């Protein structure tokens, strides 16, 4: 349907949601006739009109099959039609009908026969979606377009200015897209962590079924993010310099794409955290700051208080030594499990191996009692299923007067989680207290967010009596804490 010469726009209702570039729009020129000499079947062409396609401001509405596009009219109908607006652009009269290609703004092209395409010799009939930036687009673009960057020095100036004015709430919202363990070790002050390391969360974010807000790891970050409409948003990962070269599978790409779909205009920190820390390490934190964390899809409940806020420096995981958590309970890594001399010196007679692949070192010598808990350090691993089995083995070592070494690959996540749970079981420590206690002994610990969620659920069961605590005999070495 061509635009009316009396109107500036034509509104077309479509029966289903479509992308503007999928409409293959071309004006029906059959009524104009041919400009060929001697033709009498149609009147001569006296003018042409070039139209541009604009997507209406659409919003996501729920449906049984996921998110559906619908009008931004406040209705709750998932079947509400999609509206596209065609604005007329009057051009100078011309006598020619040119066959051409209608090229969309994102690079795809559609070729129409000459009899179906009205064109202008100066301007191609471009169908460019130029509506609101929040207009959803089906599919994933190969590259991020028009993403701006911010340099480390500029971000540092903004942060310093807000700090001096004592108005941190007026500063930019900073989003960390790196894995949670890396965020735990070091991050820019005030940055909120986006937990999209697992495939399920990434896919749901790409599909628009969840938003960036849903993946923020702490309540404080969520509250800050809700107030970003008048703020800058700065996103960073470890070392990205060119956002346009980030591949679609990377968390940075997914977060940026989601933010733009929500109508935001995020900036990317050039060079990421690595570049920022070179000159502004004083504006970075080296600790876990986690309030009411939860794993999306993991069912973790909220934490009751804040975990430790600072440690002297970034822990050296590779050079960490075997750590005595209690007089009889030691937390270590793969190398510690191989150190026969140290284990014998510490009277260790029991070993818990919390991996699926590391061997039971020295098993053939018959010097130790071994237990393997086959677990991976992933967001899907159910580690809680091994808690009671591990507790019984630890108690057996304790009653026999022997030390016990619990280890995984690095003594950071899996084995640390079980030690924290053991302290919660045998004392009145909260999850936060137990975490602080173990972190104070071994600063490198960093249970992944999935395991933190399981510890929170375990704490809830302990408090509700679903899982009983064992408080006698009292553990030695924690009297000043409990």
From Swiss-Prot:
What keywords appear on the UniProt entry? Cytoplasm, Hydrolase, Nucleus, Protein phosphatase
Q: Where is this region: Interaction with MAP kinases?
A: 199-215
Catalytically driven reaction(s): O-phospho-L-tyrosyl-[protein] + H2O = L-tyrosyl-[protein] + phosphate; O-phospho-L-seryl-[protein] + H2O = L-seryl-[protein] + phosphate; O-phospho-L-threonyl-[protein] + H2O = L-threonyl-[protein] + phosphate
Q: Does the keyword Nucleus apply?
A: yes
**In which compartments does the protein localize?**
Cytoplasm; Nucleus
- Active-site positions on this chain: 408 (phosphocysteine intermediate)
Q: Which residues form the Tyrosine-protein phosphatase domain?
A: 321-464
Residues annotated as coiled-coil are none
**Isomerase among the record's keywords?**
no
Q: A Pfam family matched by this chain, by name?
A: Rhodanese
> A Gene Ontology MF term for this entry?
protein tyrosine/threonine phosphatase activity
Rhodanese domain residues are 168-285
Query: Which GO terms fall under biological process for this protein?
Result: negative regulation of epithelial cell migration; negative regulation of epithelial cell proliferation; negative regulation of epithelium regeneration; negative regulation of ERK1 and ERK2 cascade; negative regulation of JNK cascade; negative regulation of p38MAPK cascade; negative regulation of respiratory burst involved in inflammatory response; negative regulation of stress-activated MAPK cascade
GO CC: one term?
nucleoplasm
| EC number of the protein | 3.1.3.16, 3.1.3.48
Family stated for the protein in its record: Belongs to the protein-tyrosine phosphatase family. Non-receptor class dual specificity subfamily.
Subunit structure of this entry? Monomer. Interacts with MAPK14.
Any idea what job this protein has? Answer: Protein phosphatase involved in the inactivation of MAP kinases. Has a specificity for the MAPK11/MAPK12/MAPK13/MAPK14 subfamily. It preferably dephosphorylates p38.
Report what the protein is called.
Dual specificity protein phosphatase 10
């Amino acid at each position: 349907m061509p635009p009316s010469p009396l109107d500036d726009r034509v509104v077309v209702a479509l029966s289903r949601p479509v992308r503007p570039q999928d409409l293959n729009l071309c004006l029906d020129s059959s009524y104009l006739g041919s400009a060929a000499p001697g033709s009498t079947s149609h009147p001569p062409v006296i003018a042409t009109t070039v139209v541009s396609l604009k997507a209406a401001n659409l919003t996501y509405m729920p449906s049984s099959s996921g998110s559906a596009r619908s009008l931004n009219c406040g209705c709750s109908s998932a079947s509400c039609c999609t509206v596209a607006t065609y604005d007329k652009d009057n051009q100078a009269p011309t006598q020619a009908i040119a066959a051409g290609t209608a090229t969309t703004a994102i690079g795809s092209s559609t070729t129409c026969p000459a009899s179906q395409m009205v064109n202008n010799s100066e301007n191609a009939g471009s169908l460019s979606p130029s509506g609101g930036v929040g207009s959803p687009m089906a599919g994933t673009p190969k590259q991020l377009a028009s993403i701006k960057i911010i340099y480390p020095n500029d971000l540092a100036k903004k942060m310093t200015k807000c700090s001096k004015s004592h108005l941190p709430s007026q500063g930019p919202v900073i989003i960390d897209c790196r894995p949670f363990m890396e965020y735990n070790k070091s991050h820019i002050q005030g940055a909120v962590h986006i937990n999209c390391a697992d495939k399920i969360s990434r896919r749901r974010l790409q599909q628009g079924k969840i938003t960036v807000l849903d993946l923020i790891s702490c309540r404080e970050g969520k509250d800050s993010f809700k107030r970003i409409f008048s703020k800058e948003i700065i996103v960073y990962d470890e070392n990205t310099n060119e956002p346009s070269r980030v591949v679609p599978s990377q968390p940075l790409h997914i977060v940026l794409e989601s933010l733009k779909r929500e109508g935001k205009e995020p900036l990317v920190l050039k060079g990421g955290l690595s570049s920022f820390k070179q000159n502004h390490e004083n504006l970075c934190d080296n600790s876990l700051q986690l309030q009411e964390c939860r794993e999306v899809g993991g069912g973790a409940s909220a934490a009751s208080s804040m975990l430790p806020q600072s440690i002297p420096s970034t822990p050296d995981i590779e050079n960490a030594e075997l750590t005595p958590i209690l007089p009889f309970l030691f937390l270590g890594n793969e190398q510690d499990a191989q150190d026969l001399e140290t284990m014998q010196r510490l009277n260790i007679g029991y070993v818990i191996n919390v991996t699926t692949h590391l061997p039971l070192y020295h098993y053939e010598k018959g010097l130790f009692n071994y237990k393997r808990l086959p677990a991976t350090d992933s967001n899907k691993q159910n580690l809680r299923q091994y808690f009671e089995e591990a507790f019984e083995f630890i108690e057996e070592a304790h009653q026999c007067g022997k030390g016990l070494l619990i280890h995984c690959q690095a003594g950071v996540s899996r084995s640390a989680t079980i030690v924290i749970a053991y302290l919660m079981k045998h004392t009145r420590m909260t999850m936060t207290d137990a975490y602080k206690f173990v972190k104070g002994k071994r600063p490198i610990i960093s249970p992944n967010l999935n395991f933190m969620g399981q510890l929170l659920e375990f704490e809830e069961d302990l408090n509700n009596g679903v899982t009983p605590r064992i408080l006698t005999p009292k553990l030695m070495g924690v009297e000043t804490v409990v």
